[in-house]
Swiss-Prot record:
Keywords: Oxidoreductase. Part of a complex that provides reducing equivalents for heterodisulfide reductase. This is F420-non-reducing hydrogenase subunit G. GO terms for molecular function: oxidoreductase activity. It comes from Methanothermus fervidus.
Length: 127
């Protein structure tokens, strides 16, 4: 764990997902996930020193998944669902959580879609 941002003592919990422009500049020391931003840091190889979160930008996962993670996007989707309490609180609608994300594949698979577990079709002629 390279990120120096503080996680709340009660653990991460989200009530909403926001985009960076919606919150402006995030709180300086508080975990970006705790502020409602999707940050790929927890599922990303930590060799960069968490440079993006240091300056208030959520990690996009550009160094790929950790060795312990087979599918980076699936891991983050699971983490976000956990942060919303989908597993414990049966009143949380997983579809409502997903609706808050404009582009699930683009958000969680920006750098790793070809290696993901998402089944893809290859059409003749490359289309």
């Amino acid at each position: 764990e390279e990120c120096e941002r503080e996680k709340p003592p009660e653990g991460l919990a989200m009530d909403f997902i926001k985009r960076q422009f919606e919150i402006g500049e995030p709180e300086k020391d508080l975990c970006l996930i705790a502020q409602g931003l999707v940050c790929m840091g927890p599922a990303t190889t930590s060799i960069c020193g968490a440079q993006c979160p240091k300056v208030g930008i959520p990690c996009q996962g550009c160094y790929g998944p950790t060795k312990a993670v087979e599918d980076q996007g699936a891991k983050m989707i699971s983490a976000i669902a956990s942060d919303f309490g989908v597993e414990k609180d049966k009143t949380v609608d997983p579809e409502k959580v997903a609706e808050q994300l404009d582009d699930i594949v683009g958000t969680f698979y920006t750098y790793t879609l070809p290696a993901s577990l998402i089944p893809m079709r290859v059409h003749k002629g490359g289309k």
